[in-house]
A protein has these predicted regions:
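Boundary at the C-terminal end of the N-terminal hydrophobic targeting segment
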Residues: 20-26
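C-terminal domain-boundary segment and adjacent tail
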Residues: 169-182, 226-335
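Metal-dependent polysaccharide deacetylase catalytic core of the NodB/CE4 family, i.e.
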Residues: 66-155, 178-181, 199-201, 244-251, ...
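Bacterial N-terminal signal peptides that target proteins for export
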Residues: 1-9
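Active-site beta->alpha N-cap acidic-glycine motif
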Residues: 28-92, 244-248, 252-254, 262, ...
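Bacterial N-terminal signal peptides
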Residues: 8-18
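The substrate-binding groove and active-site-proximal loops of carbohydrate-active enzymes
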Residues: 38-48, 70-75, 114-125, 143-150, ...
Length: 514
């Protein structure tokens, strides 16, 4: 896998150069609208869905559109077992992503991750999902550039494993994490997630088991979806930076009335393969209507000026995180310190954005370098520290810390960041433990004093603070409720971890608009 990751890095770097050249050579005009089309390619029960995926991929290739086919590990193995090289080759002309190893078989990802902390959850995700990732990579001969969880199985620990594998784009839809309906960075990955445009461009489909006894009125909202796209296009193209539109389909929904997994794994069921059922097929006229919807809509989107279909690896370049490997001057450090508030959050500027964990890393490095007589040296941001692995009790009053203790603690925090690449759950001033939020606010005050007066405050004041970005993470367990989960599912530990990882949250700035 290491060679694949290095190769993927070279591909992305070259892609970035091409995109940058195209952007800088463009004339000024309306903002460019980038379309990201993806298919969750997952049904490994009904063989006919293989031909649907091939038909969709072939049509797009003929249209000059490169989409993303995100494949489940078992689906890839199914194609290999059935010797469907024709399907594999058709999909391989597009970008490949990963969509879990077994999708809806129990336990689902959220279920096995719920009782685990961050580190154990990353390891378990590696153990269970890693074989599927490797099979998708091997069978398609292509590094899977992006990921989406199956249904409502989102788990924050997956980000740690995906980062280790070299996957840098989380392209999906859900309510678990979001930032005002726009792309963002979270867990070291670029997230095109929880954006409203995805739902607005979906066909009207009733895939409930009860729908088989009703008239099939699916795929009848083409004109409404076209109108939605036109509104989205006009809004985004009116902005100089343009925008990114993410929309998706499942190959199986073109020919089946009920989802393949809903009839096999409902409400926590996990029957053996010998008892799996084939989903009921649609009436041929309805399937024809579905393909007409798809083909007509794709050609409709291409009729607009300044519209370009892009893949996740290209999106990663369009949203390049220029804060990484940037050398921050003393003036920039001063601006960052001034931006720290007791409501700890990310910082967004015209040229870059910083997550709360990156702010902590930069300011702490500055304080330690100043202690060592190198306060004027530029500081390079090298990666994003993860959030803490556990919550600590928040201060409800201020405490005064002698400078000799604060300076020793700053060096201890620096060692922790270097060794663990995450924010400490508790910051210790001798026997006095405080939350990392309170430490960050006090640290910003120390940096401001060092820069303004050339001397640290003595004592340094540490007061109450809280992680304001936690509001952007899921707040209750309803986000994990879907037909595959057991009834009354509860995910309190995943909610806590999701909030802690908002230390890594920040806006993603589109740099390819024109």
């Amino acid at each position: 896998m290491r060679k694949d990751i290095i190769f993927m890095g070279l591909v992305l770097a070259l892609g970035g150069l091409c995109l940058a050249t195209a952007v800088h050579g463009a004339q000024s005009g309306p903002g460019r609208v980038y379309l990201v089309l993806w298919f969750d390619t997952e049904d490994y029960v009904l063989p006919q869905t293989n031909d649907v995926a091939k038909r969709l991929a072939t049509f797009l290739t003929q249209q000059g559109v490169r989409a993303t086919f995100r494949v489940v590990g078992e689906k890839a193995r199914m194609l290999e077992r059935e010797n469907r090289r024709d399907v594999i080759e058709a999909l391989d002309r597009h970008e490949i992503g990963f969509h879990s190893n077994l999708h809806s078989q129990q336990p689902t990802i959220d279920m096995y991750e719920e009782p685990l902390n961050w580190e154990a959850g990353v390891e378990e995700y590696n153990r269970r999902e890693g074989p599927g990732f490797e099979d998708v990579r091997r069978i398609f001969g292509q590094f899977p550039t992006n990921y989406c969880q199956p249904g409502a199985t989102w788990a924050p620990q997956s980000y740690g494993a995906l980062d280790q594998w070299g996957v840098k784009v989380y392209l999906c839809n859900g309510r678990d994490i979001g930032l005002d309906g726009k792309p963002f960075w979270y867990g070291r990955l670029l997230n095109i997630y929880n954006v409203p445009e995805t739902g607005a461009l979906r066909p009207n489909i009733d895939d409930s088991p009860e729908s088989v006894n009703k008239p099939d009125t699916d795929w009848t909202n083409l004109e409404k979806v076209k109108a939605n796209f036109r509104e989205i296009y006009l809004r985004m193209s009116s902005q100089p930076e343009g925008g990114v539109v993410s929309f998706m389909f499942h190959p199986y929904e073109f020919i089946t009335k009920v989802d393949w997994d809903i009839i096999n794994f409902p409400h926590g069921a996990n029957p053996p393969r010998s008892e799996w059922k084939l989903p009921p097929l649609r009436n041929p006229e309805v399937s024809a209507r579905a393909f007409h919807f798809f083909e007509n809509f794709i050609t409709y989107t291409k009729s607009f000026p300044n519209v370009e279909y892009v893949t996740p690896s290209q999106v990663l370049m369009l949203f390049a995180d220029v804060a990484q490997q940037h050398s921050f001057s003393s003036q920039e450090i001063s601006r960052i310190a001034a931006g720290v508030e007791p409501e700890v959050s990310f910082q967004a500027y015209d040229d870059y954005a910083l997550s709360a964990s990156e702010v902590l890393a930069l300011l702490n490095k500055f304080a330690v370098q100043t202690l060592r007589g190198r306060g004027s040296d530029p500081i390079t941001l090298d990666g994003t520290p993860y959030g803490p692995d556990a919550r600590s009790a928040a201060l409800d009053h201020t405490v005064e810390i002698p400078w000799n203790q604060f300076s020793r603690t700053a060096q201890d925090v620096e060692g922790f960041l270097e060794a663990n690449r995450r924010v400490p759950g508790v910051v210790w001033f001798g026997s006095q433990g405080v939350s990392p939020e309170s430490y960050l606010v006090a640290l910003a005050g120390v940096v401001k004093a060092l820069q303004a007066k050339g001397a640290p405050p003595d004592p340094a004041v540490v007061g109450p603070a809280y992680l304001a970005t936690a509001k952007y993470a899921v707040q209750d367990s309803r986000a994990w409720r879907w037909e595959i989960s057991p009834d009354h599912v509860q995910r309190p530990d995943l909610i806590d971890i999701a909030k802690l990882q908002t230390w890594t949250l920040k806006p993603a700035k589109l740099r390819g608009g024109r």
